[in-house]
Swiss-Prot record:
It catalyses: D-erythro-1-(imidazol-4-yl)glycerol 3-phosphate = 3-(imidazol-4-yl)-2-oxopropyl phosphate + H2O. Belongs to the imidazoleglycerol-phosphate dehydratase family. One of its GO terms (molecular function) is imidazoleglycerol-phosphate dehydratase activity. PROSITE patterns: IGP_DEHYDRATASE_1 (PS00954), IGP_DEHYDRATASE_2 (PS00955). The gene is hisB. PANTHER family: IMIDAZOLEGLYCEROL-PHOSPHATE DEHYDRATASE, IMIDAZOLEGLYCEROL-PHOSPHATE DEHYDRATASE HIS7. It comes from Bradyrhizobium sp. (strain ORS 278). GO terms for cellular component: cytoplasm. Pathway: Amino-acid biosynthesis; L-histidine biosynthesis; L-histidine from 5-phospho-alpha-D-ribose 1-diphosphate: step 6/9. GO terms for biological process: L-histidine biosynthetic process. It comes from the Bacteria. This is Imidazoleglycerol-phosphate dehydratase. Coiled coil: none annotated. Its main location: cytoplasm.
Amino acid sequence: MRSAAIKRKTKETDIEVSVNLDGTGVVEIATGIGFFDHMLDLLARHSRIDMTVKAVGDLHIDFHHTTEDVGIALGQAVKQALGDMAGITRYASIHMPMDETLTRVVIDVSGRPMLVFRTAFSRDKIGEFDTELVREWFNAFAMNAGITLHVETLYGENAHHIAESCFKGLARALRAALAIDPRNKGEVPSTKGQLGG
């Protein structure tokens, strides 16, 4: 079973996460940020990754530290659960619609972290959640998971729909890229014989 648990504690946040990459999307999320919990719930359910996230942060200041640190911890958990990445499909490309919005998410589980994020929001906040934090979370996740991740919203108007299409797109891309390809016969999908360098 490809699973991992991470604890991260700083002066700003106290976070515990766990993932099972071969799960069914069983999810337990509690960050204290309603909209963010909703996005993480979508991520788990549509990726089919079993996911637990418990976070206590300095929400009296703002949501930045909690959002970013959850991205760091989840990224670290996914990377740890992947191990040497033997047998994975590695690549995936998804177009994710959400009503009037369409977002493209392309992923390479390469061990080389990179984020290209081309998404503009129609307003600064979704409820109390700053829309700029969507990029902050994706960056923290990609850097710590060690994945190359391209997220581009091709068009869209509603800020909630734009964010949701990004998270659902990532979920479906992870579901495809992390899947074990039986044709790989347990080999690392790289001509180098290893990923991450």
